[in-house]
């Protein structure tokens, strides 16, 4: 199943913790996965959802 990226709607500020970002995406936003990705000009928490 293809996953599409979407910036986290509940994360604020710079993303410096992959585990915290992933947990927040999964628990709060019902995403499949999450990670800190560099999106100019800073790292952001990106959630991955089924497309």
UniProtKB/Swiss-Prot annotation:
Q: Using the record's annotations, give every residue carrying the modification Pyrrolidone carboxylic acid.
A: 1
Q: Which GO terms describe its biological process?
A: defense response to fungus; killing of cells of another organism
Which residues are modified to Phosphoserine?
8
Keyword terms: Antimicrobial, Disulfide bond, Fungicide, Phosphoprotein, Pyrrolidone carboxylic acid
Intrachain S-S bonds = 4-51, 15-36, 21-45, 25-47
Q: Name one Pfam family in it.
A: Gamma-thionin
Q: What does this protein do?
A: Possesses antifungal activity sensitive to inorganic cations.
Q: Which family does it belong to?
A: Belongs to the DEFL family.
- Relate the assembly described in the record: Forms oligomers in its native state.
What is the protein's name according to its record?
Defensin-like protein 2A
**Organism of provenance:** Sinapis alba
């Amino acid at each position: 199943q293809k996953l599409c990226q979407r910036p986290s709607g509940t994360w604020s500020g710079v993303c410096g913790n992959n585990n915290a970002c992933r947990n927040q995406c999964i628990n709060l936003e019902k995403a499949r996965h999450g990670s800190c990705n560099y999106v100019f000009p800073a790292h952001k928490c990106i959630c991955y959802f089924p497309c």
